[in-house]
Curated annotation (Swiss-Prot):
Its main location: membrane. It is found in: Cell inner membrane. It comes from Zymomonas mobilis subsp. mobilis (strain ATCC 31821 / ZM4 / CP4). HAMAP family: TatA_E. This is Sec-independent protein translocase protein TatA. InterPro entries: TatA/B/E, TatA/E.
Amino acid sequence: MGGMSITHWIVVAVVVMIFFGKGRFSDMMGDVAKGIKSFKKGMSEDDTTPPAAPPAPAPRLENQPLPPENTTQNVAQNVPNDIKNNQ
């Protein structure tokens, strides 16, 4: 029960042939086959492409000056004037 037997598949095939006709159905199957063939060809062409060049190395940071550390003198210079006046 609920399984599809061979007679069910024959009935489905006959109904499809009636709706689409013999010519349209074979044309559709031919188009599907051409699509699969071109897809396989496209996939095989992707495999033969040469690998990309390696990316350029990142610049080294050893020659760049370091930012000043947050000392109390630097922090005091960065405090806005209205806060300084309120203390």
